[in-house]
């Protein structure tokens, strides 16, 4: 049997936006009413995505980490879910600064991420419009989903599957670039040797 592809995903966002609820909804198809928002957890999950077995390691960050912890999590992850609460404008405004930190830590690589507006079931208390979420996702050059970890509204499974697909696509592109670059170095070395021999 072929070895499964391994993907490391990390969930970021302000405390209370529903990161843990989102992960638990994805893994168990259930909603948890009570949990400790200060706990950080790592989950393992295996799924078949586009006929390939993928092993996900999902880091659910507490949202209250210090800078060193957060940067460590960002270095660890390959794909990122940035979550805000549609009823909390402050959580939405924290997304761009988070992305900027990610860019700084991951450079020169492009960051693979998905933007998620959670708590879509609380539309009556909405502070962030769907259009604002879409506009930010365009700025961040990433996919955007609105969902509810509480009701299961929105395709939560697709959020995680799409992020895995994107991580694997980026890996393939980087692998091809690396191979091309090493082939170029070999060609340059041979040309230098031939130049020396002929001179």
UniProtKB/Swiss-Prot annotation:
One of its GO terms (molecular function) is nuclear estrogen receptor binding. Pfam families: Ras. GTP binds at residues 13-20, 60-64, 118-121. It is found in: Cytoplasm. Detected in heart, brain, placenta, lung, liver, skin, kidney and pancreas. Detected in estrogen receptor-positive breast-derived cell lines, but not in estrogen receptor-negative cell lines. Expression is decreased or lost in a significant proportion of primary breast tumors with poor clinical prognosis. Induction: Up-regulated by estradiol. Down-regulated by tamoxifen. Its main location: cytoplasm. Belongs to the small GTPase superfamily. Ras family. NCBIfam families: small_GTP. Binds GDP/GTP and possesses intrinsic GTPase activity. Has higher affinity for GDP than for GTP. In cell lines overexpression leads to a reduction in the rate of proliferation, colony formation and in tumorigenic potential. This is Ras-related and estrogen-regulated growth inhibitor. It comes from Homo sapiens (Human).
């Amino acid at each position: 049997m072929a070895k499964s592809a391994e993907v490391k995903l990390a969930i970021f966002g302000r405390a209370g936006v529903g990161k843990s609820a989102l992960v638990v909804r994805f893994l168990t198809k259930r909603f948890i009413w009570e949990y400790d928002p200060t706990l950080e957890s790592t989950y393992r999950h295996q799924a078949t995505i586009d006929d390939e077995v993928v092993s996900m390691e999902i880091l659910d960050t507490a949202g209250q980490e210090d800078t060193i912890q957060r940067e460590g999590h960002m270095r660890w992850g390959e794909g990122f879910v940035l979550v805000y609460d549609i009823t909390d404008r402050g959580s939405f405004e924290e997304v761009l600064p988070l992305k900027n930190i990610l860019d700084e830590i991951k450079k020169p690589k492009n960051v693979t991420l998905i933007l998620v507006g959670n708590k879509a079931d609380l539309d009556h208390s909405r502070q962030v419009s769907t259009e604002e979420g879409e506009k930010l996702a365009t700025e961040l050059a990433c996919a955007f989903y609105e969902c509810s970890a509480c009701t299961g509204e929105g395709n939560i499974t697709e959020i995680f599957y799409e992020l895995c697909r994107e991580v694997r696509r980026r890996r393939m592109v980087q692998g091809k670039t690396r191979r091309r670059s090493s082939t170029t170095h070999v060609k340059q070395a041979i040309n230098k040797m031939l130049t020396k021999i002929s001179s």
